[in-house]
């Protein structure tokens, strides 16, 4: 029987500080719980939303119950006995990190059991010899930034100087990343991509996970804004991914929506669809759910929860986006085929109520829906790789090296 898998990954949607959160300075972080608390207390009201957080379709898949198991506390405003149609778990990350790459790789069978390279200094973050080599290889005359920064704030602070000099803006964060911002029209998108590609090759020996192109437009600090033409240059995964097994063993299609292909360095991806906004990501996902052939894996990363609301520490915006997503989830559920497996999960936390602007080390929800899947609690996963192993089981693939299968269908013992 031909099967499909649909993975909807809500980037940064953690559900409570993990057991090792103290090691990351993240004790007390709870992305969902703290958003729900703010909403319940009318602290996230805006022109777009008000009152308690309303996520009926996510609740029906087990989100609230998963959060209860992870944090020992039901999110405020959630039902203790929802009309459950899905099976749910929560997962601890095996990789010793809280970044996008580590979380995504682990769930597809390649946990990061080595240390990424990081730029830890808040100012003068990058080694001079690296900067000199980038300048020599790319012929740029100078650069701005060279610090830890919020991506939206640094273009406000340095965007006008960038337009005067055409020096690219280099910055980083607590993640293993080197980001380059430049004006899409004045500096040129192709020039930015070429610069990022060269920087990626220079930084690869340092095990920097990603170089990210961050194009923006606008004429001054009041109207600078990032565009949808972000591009990630990522190190290739070190182990065979679930995607590759699916292609080799079942001749499957692996459909990337959003930044998925970039995260996996395009390994094992057969079709790619970009989208610039949360609405567009939902639209493209729904289109693929309706039209993708059987024997397909559809994987969407909903990046805006992280980039627009988590890092920006925008509780109300995050809540509004979650409620919008939940309404669109109804459409996905209505268009699933007879033998589709739907999975909702996250890659790390990014609590908008927490100190700083970085990711937070949290448990993630793991929610499954299939017509023959018993609605039940599936336990705590000790690795995100349980997601990939469960998919491998469902698709009839050979086992991955990491993770355990969580699925038990009706009629099975």
Question: For each predicted feature, which ranges?
Answer:
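Feature captures the catalytic ectodomains and active-site-proximal regions of enzymes
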Residues: 1-413
